[in-house]
Amino acid sequence: MTRPRPEAVDNQSPKGWLCIVLHAHLPYIRHPECEFMLEENWLFEAITECYIPLLAMFDNLVNDRVPFRITWSLSPTLCSMLTDPVLQQRYVKYIDRLINLAEMECERTKRMPEFRDTARMYLDKFLLCRKMFVDNDSCDLVSHFRLLQDAGVFEIITSAATHGYLPALQNAPRSARAQVLLGKESYRRWFGRDPAGMWLPECGYYPGVEHLLSEAGISYFFSDAHGILFAQPRPRYGVFAPLICKDAGVAAFGRDSASSKAVWSAKEGYPGDYHYREFYRDIGFDLDIDYIRPYIDPIGIRSTTGIKYYKITGKTEDKKPYVREEALRRAAVHAGNFMFNREKQIDYCASLMDRQPIVVAPYDAELFGHWWYEGPQWLNFLIRKMAFEQNTVGLCTASDYLSANPVNQEAGPSFSSWGYKGYSEIWINGSNDWIYPQFQTMEKRMSDAVETHREAGSLAKRALNQMAREQLLAQSSDWAFIMKSGTMVNYAQSED
C-alpha cells in the first residue's frame, strides 16, 4: 500500500520568514599544463561532498512536491570552473579513482562489521556523483542550478567577478567597479537573466559600495549583523528587516547571529555533535602508504580522500566508528531544534513589529557535506519539517520579501565583514598587506595601457583583455586569506 503524502501546512501568511542563503565560491584554479595539481582537488571535493549531494537533495524535495525557496550565491570563478571542459574531464577521472578506491575498501572491510557499511555508503555516494555529473548533467552542474532556478525553488545571485574583497579596493575604485559590473555580466551569460542580488565577498561592505551595486542594477546584498545594527540612523527593526541604502535604493539584509551560531560553530553548534562524522580522520592518512599511494598526490604526499570511518566521539584521539543511522537521527533532532528556535524567535519579533520579520541565515555552501558531512540531510529535514510541521515561519528569498514589503527604512550601513572580529583583520594584516599597493599600481598601468592602445587592433585588445583578467584574478580575497591562515602560502603568493 502506498503511504499517503502529508499535506503541506499553509505557509502563505506566516508570522515571519527565514531566508537561507548558501554562498558557493572557490578560487579560480586551473592548470592544464600540469597532469596533477593538488589545489584542483578543492573543486573536485566540493563537487563530490557538497554540490552534488545538495542538488540531489533539492531534486528529491521537488519530486516530492515539498514547497521551499532557497537562495544560492554562485561566484563567477566557481561557475567558470564548473563549466570548463578541462576541469570537467579531470573531475570524471577523479571520481572514477574514488569509485575504484571505495570498491577496494568494500573488499578490505568486508570482515570488519564496524566499517563495512560505511565503506558501502561511500561507494554508493561516489556512484551517484558520477551518474549525476556525467549522465544527468552532461558534466555541467551550472545548468542544473539554472534548471532549479527556472523551476522557482532557487533564487541564484551573483558575486564580485573574482571574489575580490571590496573594502580593500577602495583605493582602486576602477577595480572595485569592474568586480561588480563583471560579476553581473558573468551571471547573465550563465543564467540568461540579470541577478537580483549580489553577495559581497566576505560580506565586505564599505560606505559607497551600494552606488556600484545600483549602477549594476543590483537590488540587494547581505551584510553581517553589525553592519546593520551600527547603521545611521539606528535601524528600527534591527536585523529583522532590510534597510534601504540612502541615495542608492539598494536593500541591505543583515545576518542573524543566533541562526548563524547554531550551524557555524563547531563548539556550540550542531556540527560538533559527537555522533557526526569526524572530518580529520581520513584513510589518506590512516592507511598504509603503499595501499593508498595511487589515490593521493603522485609524489607521495598524503592527502585526504573523502573516506572517513570515525565519528567525532569527543575531545579525544580515540575515535569510535561512524554509524550513519545514529548521525541521521541527530540531524533530524537538530533540524527540529533549529525550527523550534526560529518559531520562538519569529513569534517574539512579530509581536514587536508592524510587518513580518525576516531572519537571514547565510552560510558557506561548502559547510554542508564537506566540513559537516550530515549538513545536506540536516537541511533536508529542516525544509520538510518547516513545510509539514508548523505554520509560523515560511521560507523566502530577499526578492520575495522586498516584493511583499517594498517600503523600508532608509539608513547607511556601517563598514563591516563577516570575518574574524567583524572587519578586515583577515584580509589586511602583516602577512598580506604588501599586495594592496600592487593592486593600485596594476590599476594605473591597466588604465595607461587602455589609453595608449585605445585604437589598437585585435591582437592588442587580446593583450589588454589578458591584462584585465590577470589583474582581477590577483584581487581574489582567497589569496590574502590563505596567506593569513598559513596554509598553501607559496601557492597563494604565486597566484597574487
Predicted regions: what they are:
Residues 21, 154-163, 193-201, 254, ...:
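Core alpha/beta catalytic barrel or barrel-like domain that forms the active/cofactor pocket
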Residues 175-200, 341-353, 357-362:
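CE4/NodB-like, metal-dependent polysaccharide N-deacetylase domain
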Residues 204, 209-218, 249:
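Hydrophobic, small-residue-rich alpha-helical packing segments that form membrane-like cores
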Residues 218-231, 397:
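His/Asp/Glu-enriched short active-site or ligand-binding loop at hydrolase and phosphoryl-transfer sites
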Residues 110-196:
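Well-ordered mid-protein domain cores that form the structural environment of catalytic cofactors
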Residues 9-69, 74-117, 124, 128, ...:
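Active-site and substrate-binding clefts of carbohydrate-active enzymes
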Residues 194-205, 364-368, 488-489:
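Conserved short loop/turn motifs at secondary-structure junctions
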Residues 71-78, 160-162, 197-206, 226, ...:
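Short, solvent-exposed turn/loop segments enriched in Gly/Ser/Thr/Pro and often Arg
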